[in-house]
């Protein structure tokens, strides 16, 4: 087993414990508590996969964190500022669009829309989002454009359900791509989106989705709309 995998799990367990102590003092807000619950489920799953006891891992994680803090200066403890990256122009972000055969799905706190009437087109996904630690922090808006510039799909956060992770965005992108490719469209991810939010792509920015997976995703959209 990779040592980095183990130590990462140990640190995550300890940091979750610190956040839990914070929540026990009734200091956490609703999004904080929601993330705490989701992360608890994730840690249990990772612990089962790795065959590691969470309590033991938490103690080991505490030692790692304490060792790091002893070596850190106050300057190093400052939180890096997030960066706002733009694929789309203001006009592309604000433009109204309509769908001939509308399909919509809510995945967590993200809303996925696409026009199932679009066939045999070359499509590119572009997005505006913030980045921290070289990873997507917050998605502002993602849209799918044809070569002619028409908008044929979109992923946007739901105002009523704030908070999403880069994995949430990846999953939503998979669903959008699967739905569009069901109609024999060719979907490509922009370079900036590929770099920070979609790292499992090939050189053309096309995600490695086998045909059976694409069909499964498209059927999922059909059944849930």
UniProtKB/Swiss-Prot annotation:
One of its GO terms (biological process) is symbiont-mediated suppression of host type I interferon-mediated signaling pathway. Residues 218-225 are annotated as: PABPN1-binding. Residues 1-73 are annotated as: RNA-binding and homodimerization. One of its GO terms (cellular component) is host cell cytoplasm. A motif (Nuclear localization signal) lies at residues 34-38. It is found in: Host nucleus; Host cytoplasm. Residues 201-225 are annotated as: Disordered. Disulfide bonds: none annotated. GO terms for molecular function: protein serine/threonine kinase inhibitor activity; RNA binding. Keywords: Eukaryotic host gene expression shutoff by virus, Host cytoplasm, Host gene expression shutoff by virus, Host mRNA suppression by virus, Host nucleus, Host-virus interaction, Inhibition of host innate immune response by virus, Inhibition of host interferon signaling pathway by virus, Inhibition of host PKR by virus, Inhibition of host pre-mRNA processing by virus, Inhibition of host RIG-I by virus, Inhibition of host RLR pathway by virus, Interferon antiviral system evasion, RNA-binding, Ubl conjugation, Viral immunoevasion. Belongs to the influenza A viruses NS1 family. Homodimer. Interacts with host TRIM25 (via coiled coil); this interaction specifically inhibits TRIM25 multimerization and TRIM25-mediated RIGI CARD ubiquitination. Interacts with human EIF2AK2/PKR, CPSF4, IVNS1ABP and PABPN1. HAMAP family: INFV_NS1. This is Non-structural protein 1.
């Amino acid at each position: 087993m990779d040592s980095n995998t183990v130590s990462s799990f140990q640190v995550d367990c300890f940091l979750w414990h610190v956040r839990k102590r914070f929540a026990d003092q009734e200091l956490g807000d609703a999004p904080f508590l929601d993330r705490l619950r989701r992360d608890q489920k994730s840690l249990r799953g990772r612990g089962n996969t790795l065959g590691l006891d969470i309590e033991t891992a938490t103690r080991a994680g505490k030692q790692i964190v304490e060792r790091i803090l002893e070596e850190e200066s106050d300057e190093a403890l400052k939180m890096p500022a997030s960066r706002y990256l733009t694929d789309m122009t203001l006009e592309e972000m604000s433009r109204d669009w309509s769908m001939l055969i509308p399909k919509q799905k809510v995945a967590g706190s993200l809303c996925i829309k696409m026009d199932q009437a679009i066939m045999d087109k070359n499509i590119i996904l572009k997005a505006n989002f913030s980045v921290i630690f070289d990873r997507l922090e917050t998605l502002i808006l993602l849209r799918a454009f044809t070569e002619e510039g028409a908008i044929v799909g979109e992923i946007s956060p739901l105002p009523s359900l704030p908070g999403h992770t880069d994995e949430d965005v990846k999953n939503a992108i998979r669903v959008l791509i699967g739905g569009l490719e069901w109609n024999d469209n060719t979907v490509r991810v922009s370079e900036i989106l590929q770099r920070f939010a979609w790292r499992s792509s090939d050189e053309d920015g096309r995600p490695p989705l086998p045909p059976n997976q694409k069909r499964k995703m498209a059927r999922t959209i059909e059944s849930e709309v």
